[in-house]
Amino acid sequence: MEQPFGSWGWGRSQLGRVAMACALAAGALVGSGAGGLTTAAADPADIAEPAVVRPPDVPTESAPPQPDHLAAARHLKQHKNATPVGTNDFGCRPTAAHPRPVVLAHGTDSTAYSDWSAIGPQLVAAGFCVFALNYGGAPGADTYGTEDLRVSAYQIGQFVDLVLDSTGAAEVDLVGFSQGANVTRYYTNKLGGAAKVDKWIGVASPTYGGVMYGLVPVAQVIPGALDVFAKVTSTAAVQQAQGSPIMLELNAGGDTVPGVRYVTIGSRVDEMIQPFSNIALRGAGAENLVVQDLCPDNLTGHFHMVYDPFVQELVLRALDPEHAPMPTCEPVALGTGIPQVIIAGNS
């Protein structure tokens, strides 16, 4: 297996809504009293194989790179159909140097443009055919990644088939941010996608779920608490809680499958996925990169990952270890990007 980082010498989405959800859920917990214990949280949408899956939305209005989530959100207000410039060009044909199209999957309560406005054009400039979908949206919604993860995984499969049919390629490389990592891995591992996927890259991947600022362990033993959280966030947000049925299902029998090359890119100071060790895959051959192990002074967290230049370069190098330059290590302050995400989520 390629190990593009083994020789190195160096030792998002809508936070405002999540913060509101945490406050409301905490209030519900306080008001509920002792209640009683339950053995496991119910999955909000427990469907093993959906009878009908709406096709994913494919944005087509080319839009410029942005420096952060806030700038992307402001552009989206006037351009709902925005896609990162150069992406979703269905006339693109892979080259010998880059034979596989790259499919980008955004995170929770987000869009292709919100999360990939910077990385998408970088990959296009590097010579890749790049495609980005909007998946997991409720009918009529202008944000995505909120619905059942299993249904979203089927949408990923539909989009991969569209990309392969259009480009003539045999396989794709998948790059998922946050929830996007989970739904692309569900497609790869559980829906037969491995036959069509060469590389899977998870950026800030909630591989084993998160504790949502410490609320999850408490909420899982108080009846109704997760229902409160789901109502003020989304089905998808609750499904990504540590120990949820779908997290257990996704990782049952091993978190990787043969024939696919896996890379995770995580941060020790991820605001949403704690313990941060929940990001790493445990399957044989998976490569788990931690930003601070490679660049100790870079304290980027969950919400800034896709707009951090170092992480962007890690993604490019994971996709193209033979040609991509070595990432440049620069200090990044703790909490970078969070104010922009809060403003974007409440404006």
Residue ranges, per PLM feature:
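The feature captures the conserved acid-bearing segment of alpha/beta-hydrolase catalytic domains
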Residues: 237-273
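Conserved alpha/beta-hydrolase
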Residues: 122-140
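Glycine-rich "HGGG/HGxG" loop immediately N-terminal to the catalytic nucleophile
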Residues: 114, 134-147
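Flexible, membrane-associating and regulatory peripheral segments of lipid-active enzymes
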Residues: 2-121, 330-337, 342-347
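Extracellular/periplasmic catalytic domains that process cell-envelope and extracellular macromolecules
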Residues: 94-98, 124-125, 166-167, 175, ...
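Serine-dependent carboxylesterase/thioesterase catalytic core
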Residues: 105-106, 130, 150-251
